Every structure is written in structure tokens, then in C-alpha cells.
């Protein structure tokens, strides 16, 4: 009776929380904090600030009602239940043969069986080719299924099983193709990032050329001003104009820098 109630609980659409939540009371939490402070005392007898890991908490001498407050160790093997269905902890995709389903495509490329040397690398499976074949088989089997229903509907089970097997094989092939799809997506993202970086480098080179031209012009104006140090009024006026042009060129450099940085 208890097992049946537990199965109903696991299979409900919105499963209730596990019963251990009842132990998360303010008193139990306070007792756990006191035990942690007591265990973290140093040689001077004063508690030290410490970030406790679940493994360290499990190593403490805790009463049974407080042990439920400590996170359990994360399992790396075995199964877990989701709405009454067992799920494997392993992320590896099980083969159709392991699941007791007939596999309609080869496990490796047919060219691998004709290899002369076993040291040669195996060729990847042509997923698109076999997906297309399975899609055509689905259409053909569906037409046959409709024909069976029109002639002798009581013999539909075999065709339904064939359609089910074809759909499972197509779905499994798509799952096998996902790692390749992830690699292609990563390659595309890296190429976009590389193109953006090259564009930024080109903009920086262009800005560098503009600033270099302005600095060379300033240097030429400075050399020309130092080569004619006359003290006449006309030269003083020219020197004032040169100084004004130097200020304008310097302002141009800052405007260029501000514009590129803001852009």
C-alpha cells in the first residue's frame, strides 16, 4: 500500500517536496549554526569565519534530525526518477541496440568495412543520407498503412510498429548529429568574433595614420619656426600665427581621439 502511494506521488504532474523539508525548522537551523561555530573554533577558542562545504558538514558529528539539513553527495552513477520514469545519470547517448530497438542504419560508414589497414581513421557517418532514406521510408510506410486500413483494418499493428521504429531511428540520428551541429555553431561564432576583431584593428590603424600625419605636421612647423628666429614685428606675427596653428592642430588631434573613442 505504501509503495503504491509512493508511485502515485512520483507520477503526479506536480510532485510534492520530499518529506525531509519538515526538518528545516528555525530551531534545527539554529542548532546547526551552533555546531558549526563550535567546530570552527581555533586555538584561541574563538570561532573563525569559514565557508563549509557539504563534505565537511557531513563529516561533523550531527544528530539524525540535523543530518537531513546537509546536502547529500552528488551521485555520478546510477539512475534517478522523474515523474515515475527512471533516467540515467550518464550523459552518453545509449545505442538503439542497448534499448532493444532495431537499428536501420549502420553504426559506422560502410566504407570502413572495405579499409585495407585497420590503422586508418574511420569516416564519419553520413547522417543526412540516412535521414533522407528514413524520411522516404516513412512516406512509403504511411501509404502502406493507409492501404492496410482501407483493406483490413485489423492488421494495422505491424505497420504502426514499423512507423514507430522509423521515427525512433530518425530521432536517434538527429541526436547523434547534435555534437557536429554544436561544433559548426562554435566555428561560426569564432569566425564572427575574428571578423569583428579584424575590423577593430583596421579602425585603429586608420586612427593611428591620422594622428601620425598630424604629429608630423606639428613637427615640421616646429622645425620651421626654430630655423628662422628673427625678432621683427612681421616674424612675431608669423610666430603668433604658427602658435595658433599649433593649438588648432593639437585640438584636431584631441577631436580625432574623442570621435574615435566615442564611436
Swiss-Prot record:
Annotated GO MF terms: transcription coregulator activity
Basic and acidic residues biased stretches: 24-47, 234-247
Polar residues compositional bias, start-end: 1-10, 101-111
Pfam families the record matches: Med7 (PF05983)
Major localization class: nucleus
Location of the protein in the cell: Nucleus
InterPro entries named among the record's database cross-references: Med7/Med21-like (IPR037212), Mediatior_Med7 (IPR009244), Mediatior_Med7_sf (IPR044888)
Gene Ontology, cellular component aspect: core mediator complex; mediator complex
The entry's keywords: Activator, Nucleus, Transcription, Transcription regulation
Chain positions covered by the region annotation Disordered: 1-57, 101-122, 222-247
GO BP terms in the entry: regulation of transcription by RNA polymerase II
Family matches, as SUPFAM superfamilies: Mediator hinge subcomplex-like
Task of the protein: Component of the Mediator complex, a coactivator involved in the regulated transcription of nearly all RNA polymerase II-dependent genes. Mediator functions as a bridge to convey information from gene-specific regulatory proteins to the basal RNA polymerase II transcription machinery. Mediator is recruited to promoters by direct interactions with regulatory proteins and serves as a scaffold for the assembly of a functional preinitiation complex with RNA polymerase II and the general transcription factors.
Complex formation: Component of the Mediator complex.
Entry's family note: Belongs to the Mediator complex subunit 7 family.
Protein name per UniProt: Mediator of RNA polymerase II transcription subunit 7
Species this protein is from: Aspergillus niger (strain ATCC MYA-4892 / CBS 513.88 / FGSC A1513)
Gene name for this UniProt entry: med7
